[in-house]
């Protein structure tokens, strides 16, 4: 029988700071991080504060599907 993969899944975190002016950004676009989370411990969507090189500041990154 095959072994289950477990509770860890790969997720994508996207910068949610849309209010930054284009002149303050380093480059256009949206920055994303990939990470893993444990589905059993964190069933809801994750929000982490990380550095966004596009915005050139620390922003809230939200989990996307």
Curated annotation (Swiss-Prot):
GO terms for cellular component: chloroplast; ribonucleoprotein complex; ribosome. GO terms for biological process: translation. Keywords: Chloroplast, Plastid, Ribonucleoprotein, Ribosomal protein. It is found in: Plastid, Chloroplast. The keyword Chloroplast applies. It comes from the Eukaryota. InterPro entries: Ribosomal_bL33, Ribosomal_bL33_CS, Ribosomal_bL33_sf, Ribosomal_zn-bd. The keyword Membrane does not apply. One of its GO terms (molecular function) is structural constituent of ribosome. It holds the Pfam family Ribosomal_L33. Belongs to the bacterial ribosomal protein bL33 family. PANTHER family: 50S RIBOSOMAL PROTEIN L33, CHLOROPLASTIC, LARGE RIBOSOMAL SUBUNIT PROTEIN BL33C. This is Large ribosomal subunit protein bL33c. The lineage of its organism: Eukaryota, Rhodophyta, Bangiophyceae, Bangiales, Bangiaceae.
């Amino acid at each position: 029988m095959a072994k289950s993969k477990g509770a860890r899944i790969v997720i994508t975190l996207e910068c949610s700071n849309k209010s930054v002016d284009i002149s303050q950004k380093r480059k256009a676009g949206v920055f994303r991080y990939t990470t893993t989370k444990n589905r059993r411990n964190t069933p809801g969507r994750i929000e982490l504060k990380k550095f966004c090189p596009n915005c050139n500041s620390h922003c809230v990154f939200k989990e996307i599907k």
